[in-house]
Regions:
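Nucleic-acid endonuclease domains
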Residues: 1-99, 107-284, 290-297, 303-412
Length: 412
């Protein structure tokens, strides 16, 4: 698959899907074997199958959405096995699948809220208001919600709730909105496996098409964690309507894995949880590296903010130097802006497709940028600006390999 990088632009999931279609034809996603599709994903990240497998299972911000959306893919596969017309919608809306013309919202249980046969599900919106305190729009309105709620109970045996939206529990303060989280009791419920409400008969469905096998999985850890075949996992990631799994989650964790791999190759000792070295704000850096004089250097790992980059002409590489959540202010705990004392170096990890695009080769490129080179916030001078930009010359100046890492970190 050496031609893959000729079609990849920025390495987003839409680019990978487009590349596979260019190489193998427009029906590539449905006709290609799982090994070829997984190879494309791993080549894009410069990881092998085992590294990719561990990336998913060892990082809950990745595993959690993979589990949720894999349920949608698995249920769709089961429905298609008995020729039920089904359309995947996905994304951030109120509808995940359209089944026999019925709109359905699919959810996996929130395990922390489950006990025995009583299962808890969260249906609140993941974008917009962050809680009921901020706005009741945090909850879905009954009017806009899907016709049916489909909640996973178990894969083996395959059991789900199929509940008409009018029967879902409402918010106490506003009966026009659906409560989240809410609980359903699988013991004696009249809504367990009520596929007839969707106009569906699954008596002859092929449930084995989704189940993981013990000895034959390319992603054995993830398959074990989800109970699903590697093929279902890979197709979940290659679902463009749920691009956030790859673009905003998997790629971010891949950068840390790639950098740690480089550090190990260079023989540089590091701590993966800097809070154990520096309790106060240690969590605002990603790695702590110990030099020859027993001094810790704190490193913040970032990637390219593709939408803010310019790759052609007068090249500009941009990266966000701010936390995922919070507000732009100087509050000691609620600000999303980093303090200038939070880390000593910014490790800009440039993904293989972008590295290839800007002439640095089809592998990871690492830039180790001293914090003194970063721009400060215009209003809050004790914090870094939200966005940092670098020219091609800057990238070449700060780019380091194993030797550079040793010199910069161990001798500084």
């Amino acid at each position: 698959m050496t031609e893959l990088f000729a079609y990849l632009k920025d390495g987003r999931i839409s680019d990978i899907i487009g590349a596979l279609k260019c190489i193998y034809g427009k029906d590539a996603l449905s006709t290609l074997d799982v090994h070829t599709k997984l190879t494309a994903l791993c080549l894009t990240l410069g990881l092998d199958f085992n590294e990719f497998d561990r990336l998913i299972v060892e990082n809950s911000p990745v595993l959690r959405p993979v589990k949720g959306i894999a349920f949608e893919v698995a249920f769709q596969r089961i429905l298609e096995s008995v020729r039920v017309p089904v359309q995947d919608v996905g994304g951030d809306g109120d509808v995940d699948l359209i089944i026999n013309g019925h709109h359905a919202q699919l959810k996996t249980p929130n395990l922390g809220g489950c006990k025995g046969d009583v299962l808890e599900y969260k249906t609140h919106k993941t974008h917009g208001a962050k809680s009921e305190k901020e706005s009741l729009s945090y909850y879905h309105s009954i009017e806009s919600f899907a016709d049916f709620f489909v909640g996973l109970i178990s894969y083996r045996p395959f059991r789900v709730f199929v509940v008409p939206k009018d029967m879902l529990e409402r918010v106490q303060k506003d009966s026009s909105r659906i409560k989240s989280p809410f609980k359903l009791n699988a013991s004696g419920s009249c809504y367990v496996n009520r596929f007839d409400l969707l106009g569906v008969n699954l008596d002859n469905a092929d449930f084995s098409s989704i189940y993981a096998t013990d000895d034959d999985e390319l992603l054995p850890l993830t398959s074990r964690a989800t109970g699903l075949k590697t093929e279902i996992i890979v197709d979940t990631i290659l679902r463009e309507c749920n691009f956030r799994i790859w673009d905003m989650s998997i790629r971010g964790f891949a950068r840390e894995i790639a950098l740690k791999k480089e550090l190990r190759a260079a023989g540089i000792p590091f701590v993966g949880n800097p809070a154990t070295v520096r309790p106060e704000r240690g969590d605002k850096s990603d790695l702590a590296v110990l030099n020859d004089r027993s001094r810790s250097h704190f490193i913040q790992v970032k990637g390219c903010s593709v939408n803010n980059c310019r790759f052609d002409g007068d090249m500009k590489i941009a990266t966000e130097t701010q936390l995922t959540r919070g507000r732009v202010n100087d509050h000691p705990t609620q600000s999303r802006l980093y303090l200038v004392s939070d880390f000593d170096y910014l490790a800009l990890c440039i993904d293989p497709p972008i590295s290839n695009r800007i002439g640095l080769g089809a592998g990871w490129a690492f830039c180790l940028i001293p914090s003194s080179e970063l721009r400060r916030h215009a209003k809050y001078g004790n914090r870094y600006a939200s966005m940092q930009t670098f020219s091609k010359n800057d990238i070449l100046r700060f780019r380091v390999g194993c030797r550079g890492l040793i010199q910069a970190l161990l001798e500084s």
